[in-house]
Amino acid sequence: MDSGGGGGGGALRPSALDLVAALLTGRGRPEEEGWPPSLAENRHLIVLLTTSLAVLVGCGVALLVRRSSISAPAVRAQEPQPRAPAPAKRKQEAEPDPDDGRQRVAVFFGTQTGTAEGFAKALAEEAKSRYDKAVFKVLDLDEYAADDEEYEQKLKKEIIALFFVATYGDGEPTDNAARFYKWFGEGNERGEWLSNLRFGVFGLGNRQYEHFNKVGKVVDQLLAEQGGKRIVPLGLGDDDQCIEDDFNAWKELLWPELDKLLRVEDDKSAAPTPYTAAIPEYRVVLVKPEEAMHINKSFSLSNGHAVYDIQHPCRANVAVRRELHTPASYRSCIHLEFDISGTGLTYETGDHVGVYAENCTETVEEVENLLGYSPDTLFSIHADQEDGTPLFGGSLPPPFPSPCTVGTALARYADLLSFPKKSALIALASHASDPKDAERLRHLASPAGKKEYSQWIVSSQRSLLEVMTEFPSAKPPLGVFFAAIAPRLQPRYYSISSSPRMTPTRIHVTCALVYGQTPTGRIHKGVCSTWMKNSIPLEESQECSWAPIFVRQSNFKLPTDPTVPIIMIGPGTGLAPFRGFLQERLALKETGVELGHAVLFFGCRNRKMDFIYEDELNNFVETGALSELIVAFSREGPSKEYVQHKMAEKAPEIWSIISQGGYIYVCGDAKGMARDVHRTLHTIVQEQGSLDNSNTESYVKSLQMEGRYLRDVW
């Protein structure tokens, strides 16, 4: 991995403007900035001369401006705007609505990985071709309003609104929809204040998770309860299958309803013009090596922002990496520590860390060969034309930082191992030189090929790389590849397994290696876990590995009162946040703070293989940070034993802690373990509390509403 830092080469000779700028701003000592000795010695004389020159030039300019204003009073001078980043503005402020009498349709999105945003923009683009008397505005839910009052003021003015909202984690809204979701959910007292609104909602989720499309369902229900009129049934996109098909089916229900609202009488009888989505393409400019000799090769997203987030991560070195499984295990689990000293990045116990990893070298090399580009090919990538006009009506997401090499772009920014969407197949087909390849790709993306797409790509877990290998004549240009074929490589999230009370300058991660065979026989290697497994820590080399990271706040927190009893349930790497909890409790205990009872249910396969952090856990018990450690081993005895079985054995104790106002925390796999634990908890409450099924449901729900039953699941 690139160790960062600027490009090599000799010292650059400062220009006259550089010298003047440095003098006037007082930037550094001249001898430290690479000034020639003769200039450095006469710095004060140069300051005097350049300042005098600046004053004379300024007077001359002022005189000219005054004369021009007198001779042409009706013409208002416009200063040329520098091509520099403008002050941060919300998009809706920077781009006022056109006052042309057209009907406005607001298209909102709440997205975590970009899919909801992509659907919103795709729908708006198609709608523009169908309704020339309407204007479709694509709006980020977070940027729509600065505060709750503005949300209400602006939303009540909307006449037609479409919502694309994804469900993230344990039934939670995405980061950019969280503020809106919280505000909107507290709107019972507002009554039916949206009586003028016509709305439609398309949710994005995964049916394998317990709270499938919860956010979409809640938003749809709240819009109706608060007076809105539903124009199309709630769309439930399922990412476990083909969410594009779900989106297209929902659109077909939407168009007839929009026809009624947006077509004038003369147009209603006319059939809409058939729409063929254009294949998006960034503008790419190849850069000659000699023109790029001064390119900064460090990670360009780490750009000095005071607040680190998903768009502006912090570069962090890998300080420590060690294997947590014993040599007897054929699997792997990594303990990794990111060094955040001196970065300004902070975290709290229970937070998540987002990590931008890189595709492994062998994957990148295969795609380079398939595309027909050298890894050292330099290029810049743009979402606008040369005159600054946005491409595709501004619907393209901002491209990644450039100029960069093809090798760097494929390693850092392209998702090469997820299965390709149907729109990607169409883009590949348009650049396939073999007609058979093109025909087959288009068939897979067509309604007639729906079943085949589901079996050959989704069920078989065929990656984009594998599909490109099957159709070698498809060689799209870089602009098409990054805009329409390869999605942006997303950060991977991990529950932080440390406490800032113990390690304020380190963020600990506990990561299981993702490694297994797919139905096609390919060995799938997880992008981030493989990177962590192969990373070089600072304790081994100064040329250590690093990654752009950021902290995502979580509500998975210890009780504010440390005397409140807690139950923690986390098998495998689900132990991660509880290691942080226990570090926090130990630090508090060492300062004399009284602690409540704490029980940990941990699970692994075999004590001699994958009992991670065993010594640490025993130490937590010995020091009193942990009251009771209960471990389930699933591969030691004659029958498999999991954490939910241990919970059932401890049912009276669990009920006692709950009855005392205790908190329950669950971390780990949402599809299996978390469901089983939830059922077991339901049984314990029902049997120990002597409640019927209905009252049990209400009781468990009240624990969740009170924040006493928290889950960090994936």
Curated annotation (Swiss-Prot):
GO molecular function, one term: FMN binding
Catalytic function, reaction form: 2 oxidized [cytochrome P450] + NADPH = 2 reduced [cytochrome P450] + NADP(+) + H(+)
Topology Lumenal: residue spans: 1-44
EC category name: oxidoreductase
Topological domain spans for side Cytoplasmic: 66-714
Annotated function: This enzyme is required for electron transfer from NADP to cytochrome P450 in microsomes. It can also provide electron transfer to heme oxygenase and cytochrome B5.
Protein name: NADPH--cytochrome P450 reductase 3
Organism of provenance: Oryza sativa subsp. japonica (Rice)
Gene name tied to this protein: CPR3
